[in-house]
Amino acid sequence: INKVEKLERGYRIYHGDSCYEGKECVISAGRSGSKWMEQVCRDLNIHTNSNRVDIGVRVELPAGIFSHLTDELYESKIVYRTSKYEDLVRTFCMNPKGEVVNENTNGIVTVNGHSYEDPAKQTNNTNFALLVAKHFSEPFKDSNGYGESIARLSNMLGGGVIVQRFGDLIRGRRSTPE
């Protein structure tokens, strides 16, 4: 989409050489389109106040460990409040018998999870995101930029996505390929 224009009774959307009009307009830009979406909102005088970002890791473990949950409810939502800072930690995007895949968004490599109905594509692992929401107060306004900078620094430190074994994490050391 090149431009979104507010009309007296609806919207006009410009996409390449085409133009579309409608009484209502729903735009879903996703995380990679968040900067563009912020600009669209500014152009249309739409107030935004997204001053939160989810920071986390993707956890992969043998499927049997969570099978008591995933056999009953495909995508379990687990929430935990930490005792020290009272942060809410939550699971998101659970993929029973799924795989972890790399994604490149604007030059930043992150991971996501997929799972498949086809048994031939299923793995022996389950994966999910473990997230903490970070809320910012004024005057800071660029929560998406904050999250992006953490991902970019992680890529710099690890030469790509950082992979960490749980045992090494507990011992306070980096995991090695061996």
Residue ranges of predicted features:
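Residues forming the flavin
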Residues: I1-E178
